[in-house]
């Protein structure tokens, strides 16, 4: 079954539409419209249920639409992330460890529903504890979030930066592309950051990430909007 979903996700990538920057104004209007297919409570319910009929476009509305929700806090992190650190240093993971990973992974997702690291962890923990359905659900969500982000640009120039709503997602996307961050980070323009990477076979010196939405929401919250 796990192999089947990997095949399905690969086929989805063949239907990938042209890269397009998120239109936050349009997203905000549609997710607030109760008659829209993108009405956020309804769409988010489908996400929680890991509805396989959700498309990359649906995930664009889910991911970027989250920034319009009161639950979204720019630059927030989970208090439970530290509880998982111990497991990354263990040579062997037992059943009790798996259950703890599941517990804390789900706690992270309660406040950060698009946390790629928690989803990857749950994919692993559920798979090795024998719950293939929940493992596949976590993998589906993570892969589709990544596809949604990659649909926003190439990441190879400041005018085509990948739009992220979570600062950690810059590092997650580098890892997804098998690029290692080299510690170089600089502002490219008023909404884009450059992240340098070590020498690689792709001849990529670094990637650009558009974090303008984090800035915007932070500013709006400070003004009390």
What kind of feature is each model-predicted range?
Residues 1-23:
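Bacterial Sec-dependent N-terminal signal peptides
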Residues 80, 119-122:
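TPR repeat positional signature
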């Amino acid at each position: 079954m796990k192999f089947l979903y990997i095949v399905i996700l690969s086929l989805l990538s063949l239907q990938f539409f042209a890269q397009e920057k998120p239109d936050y104004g349009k997203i905000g209007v549609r997710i607030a419209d109760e008659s829209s297919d993108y009405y956020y409570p309804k769409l988010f319910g489908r996400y929680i249920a890991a509805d396989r009929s959700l498309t990359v476009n649906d995930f664009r509305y889910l991911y970027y639409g989250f920034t319009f929700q009161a639950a979204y806090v720019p630059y927030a992190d989970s208090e439970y992330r530290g509880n998982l650190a111990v497991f990354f240093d263990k040579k062997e993971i037992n059943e009790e460890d798996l259950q703890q990973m599941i517990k804390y992974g789900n706690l992270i997702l309660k406040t950060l529903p698009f946390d790629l690291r928690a989803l990857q962890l749950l994919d692993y923990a559920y798979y090795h504890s024998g719950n293939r359905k929940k493992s596949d659900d976590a993998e589906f969500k993570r892969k589709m979030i990544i596809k949604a982000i990659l649909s926003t640009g190439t990441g190879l120039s400041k005018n085509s930066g990948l739009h992220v709503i979570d600062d950690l997602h810059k590092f997650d996307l580098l890892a997804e592309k098998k690029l290692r961050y080299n510690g170089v980070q600089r502002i490219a323009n008023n909404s884009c950051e450059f992240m340098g990477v070590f020498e690689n076979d792709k001849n990529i010196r670094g990637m650009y990430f558009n974090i303008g939405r984090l800035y915007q929401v932070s500013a709006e919250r400070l003004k009390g909007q």
